[in-house]
Amino acid sequence: MSSNSSQAPPNGTPGPFDGPQWPYQAPQSTYVGVAVLMGTVVACASVVNGLVIVVSICYKKLRSPLNYILVNLAVADLLVTLCGSSVSLSNNINGFFVFGRRMCELEGFMVSLTGIVGLWSLAILALERYVVVCKPLGDFQFQRRHAVSGCAFTWGWALLWSAPPLLGWSSYVPEGLRTSCGPNWYTGGSNNNSYILSLFVTCFVLPLSLILFSYTNLLLTLRAAAAQQKEADTTQRAEREVTRMVIVMVMAFLLCWLPYSTFALVVATHKGIIIQPVLASLPSYFSKTATVYNPIIYVFMNKQFQSCLLEMLCCGYQPQRTGKASPGTPGPHADVTAAGLRNKVMPAHPV
């Protein structure tokens, strides 16, 4: 089936808003499988992102400026879950987009808006760590107003690039299995292709470049600190931990957004390309699963957040800690520079 089938259903095939798309697009079992996946994503993402927001509200010590962008990411991911994954769940149960064309446009807009906020939050997070750790601005003090500005930028930038399809520059249409909506990669033409190419550059290439630049310089800074203290085990351990953490962060970003961006670019620039509906749906579902692993990678690995979460879940009781220092909680004689750099990469303390 051609990639533009969402726009022109074959004779005898119900429209995406008219009735079940099985067996025309895929077997009914495929829709059931996707519904199970989306149900799992909705349940898990709602819990983990909700916990991030609630714990951050309840514990003042978590509300340091460097943590604002993490809460911003959790809010964006929760909205993606509510506006995108939950709608997709209902539609896949029914086999078509049951809410109609207007809701399709609204869902496409909201998922694009909050998705762009999420991916740019990861880029701003990397930039903030670079500024704090590498000090390119000298004795710069990262404060609340800087954190708020970073969060505001993600929403303003996302609105700038998610609103045009509502105003005539491209459009939001059913995609893949026709149970979710997104930008019109399929139809072609200068109107759609110019938007897709602009979106690819501004909402994938730019944030990815910023992430790679920031984390590369951060690792070089930490490596230089480790080289000056070759005998300090804590320094060497911090370098290894941060290196692993950065690799996980970058790979998670690519896993989430590379399939979606590549698919959009290929379809937009190759007219008449043949892509099966199931394959066309995969990139969208990859991006939605990020709402589960983003908070796990960026927040739940935070030692101080773990402590506050356990305290909240245990109704104020703090589990006994062993005397052995964990990787995230260096002992009293640990190297201050290494621990400081590590904590600022995955912040646990106010700066």
UniProtKB/Swiss-Prot annotation:
List residues with covalent lipid attachment of type S-palmitoyl cysteine: 314-315
Disulfide bridge positions per record = 104-181
Topological type in the membrane? Multi-pass membrane protein
Q: Which residues cross the membrane?
A: 31-55, 68-92, 108-127, 147-170, 195-222, 245-268, 277-301
Q: Gene Ontology cellular component?
A: ciliary basal body; lamellar body; lamellar body membrane; membrane; photoreceptor outer segment; plasma membrane
Q: Cite the record's tissue specificity text.
A: Pineal gland.
Principal localization reads membrane
User: Could you provide one GO biological process annotation from this protein's UniProt record?
Assistant: phototransduction
What PTM annotation applies here?
Phosphorylated on some or all of the serine and threonine residues present in the C-terminal region.
Q: Where in the cell is it found?
A: Membrane
SUPFAM superfamilies recorded for this chain?
Family A G protein-coupled receptor-like
Record topological domains on the Extracellular side: 1-30, 93-107, 171-194, 269-276
Where N6-(retinylidene)lysine occurs, the residues are: 288
Q: Which residues lie on this side of the membrane: Cytoplasmic?
A: 56-67, 128-146, 223-244, 302-351
Annotated GO MF terms: G protein-coupled photoreceptor activity
In the UniProt record, which residues carry a glycan? 4, 192
Keywords on this record?
Chromophore, Disulfide bond, G-protein coupled receptor, Glycoprotein, Lipoprotein, Membrane, Palmitate, Phosphoprotein, Photoreceptor protein, Receptor, Retinal protein, Sensory transduction, Transducer, Transmembrane, Transmembrane helix
Question: Hey, which family's this protein in?
Answer: Belongs to the G-protein coupled receptor 1 family. Opsin subfamily.
- Primary role: Produces a slow and prolonged phototransduction response consistent with the non-visual function of pineal photoreception.
Protein's recorded name: Pinopsin
